[in-house]
Amino acid sequence: MSKRDYYDVLGVSKGASADEIKKAYRGKAKELHPDRNKDNPDAESLFKEVNEAYEVLKDAEKKAAYDRFGHAAFEGGMGGGQRPGGGFGSGDFSSAFSDVFEDLFGDFMGGQRGGGGRRAARGSDLRYNLRVTLEEAFSGLQKTINVPTAVACSSCEGTGAEGGVEPTTCPTCSGMGKVRAQQGFFTVERTCPTCSGLGQIIKNPCKSCRGQGRVEKDRALSVNIPAGVETGTRIRLAGEGEAGMRGGPPGDLYIFVEVAKHELFERDGVNLYCRVPVSMAKAALGGAIEVPTIDGGRGRVQVPAGSQSGRQMRLRSKGMPALRGGGIGDMFIELAVETPVNLTSKQKDLLREFDELSEDNNPETKSFFSSVKSFWDGMKG
């Protein structure tokens, strides 16, 4: 059977750039990989064809020879005998995709990447949920928290080895933490089964930590909570997470702040809102009222005569501080005109008398019922 054109195999034009060829190869190799096409009997042969095409087209010399002579460039010579670029069969087949292998198949290998020797395992990052009051969020505070975590073992100083004996290099992976295995036409890199990827083995594990180099323990940490935090604020404490395995670097601690609801104030960014009840008389006649402020003080505002429920007044710079500077928000007072209850007979008589005398003092009521009358008249007509 005649071979397909290599450009057609990868789905690129003859003038495609090296990056375009590489991108096309990645897509085809991922699409046709046998592990993803176990029900397709042709997957393996198609996968090999893709790798064969990429082996040629990724190499400038081989590509030039292929562009000039086609497949004949790699089939025993062109009448004179020498293969340009050494020919396809002259090298290790796995080199065809060594530069993109990890990007393509990292998901099959658990996302691990090889090379560079062993790296001590970094400790995990930790999350701590911290609930604070609105007053604490306003002023900021220093707070001590207890965090359950893994700390370096004091018995072995984090090495995991008993009696100060140093770990030895793993003989299976030579300290790389990974081993390679040939699978068909390509090389697969996996975590070393002997040392679990650490590159070292311990002949006499520490009894306190069982060779892990760390133990479980609660840590007391002093945390600075800045003024202006709000629900969702995240504070990072570098190096305060779990200790790494066998001397590896520690992870980080992330504190997620939740600001508790307040019985008097509602918060919207840097502004505060306080709903203040006022009597009918105060709303009608006007006058000064005192309101609480988040700093524990008192604010004084003037209620205009004739105020209705929902009217807002502002106290400037009595809100919350901005987290990263930039001033302080305002406090808004919303009036809630309260209707009196549990009236005495005398109070009821006075209100009836007042109602009879106040027909011209309720413009909204008068306007509403005038509109209602017009609506009903229109329905009749």
From Swiss-Prot:
GO terms for MF: ATP binding; heat shock protein binding; unfolded protein binding; zinc ion binding
Annotated cofactor note: Binds 2 Zn(2+) ions per monomer.
GO cellular component: cytoplasm
Subcellular location: Cytoplasm
Gene3D superfamilies: DnaJ domain, Heat shock protein DnaJ, cysteine-rich domain, Urease metallochaperone UreE, N-terminal domain
Residues reported in the UniProt entry to bind Zn(2+) 1: 153, 156, 206, 209
ZnF (CR-type) residues: 140-218
Entry keyword set: Chaperone, Cytoplasm, DNA replication, Metal-binding, Repeat, Stress response, Zinc, Zinc-finger
Cofactor(s) the record lists: Zn(2+)
InterPro entries registered for this protein in UniProt: DnaJ, DnaJ_C, DnaJ_domain, DnaJ_domain_CS, HSP40/DnaJ_pept-bd, HSP_DnaJ_Cys-rich_dom, HSP_DnaJ_Cys-rich_dom_sf, J_dom_sf
Annotated positions binding Zn(2+) 2: 170, 173, 192, 195
CXXCXGXG motif repeat windows: 153-160, 170-177, 192-199, 206-213
Keyword Zinc tagged: yes
Primary location group: cytoplasm
GO biological process: chaperone cofactor-dependent protein refolding; DNA replication; protein refolding; response to heat
Domain J: 5-70
Comment on protein domains: The J domain is necessary and sufficient to stimulate DnaK ATPase activity. Zinc center 1 plays an important role in the autonomous, DnaK-independent chaperone activity of DnaJ. Zinc center 2 is essential for interaction with DnaK and for DnaJ activity.
Similarity comment text for this entry: Belongs to the DnaJ family.
UniProt xrefs under PANTHER family: CHAPERONE PROTEIN DNAJ, DNAJ HOMOLOG 1, MITOCHONDRIAL-RELATED
Subunit details: Homodimer.
Functional summary from the UniProt entry: Participates actively in the response to hyperosmotic and heat shock by preventing the aggregation of stress-denatured proteins and by disaggregating proteins, also in an autonomous, DnaK-independent fashion. Unfolded proteins bind initially to DnaJ; upon interaction with the DnaJ-bound protein, DnaK hydrolyzes its bound ATP, resulting in the formation of a stable complex. GrpE releases ADP from DnaK; ATP binding to DnaK triggers the release of the substrate protein, thus completing the reaction cycle.
Protein's name in the database: Chaperone protein DnaJ
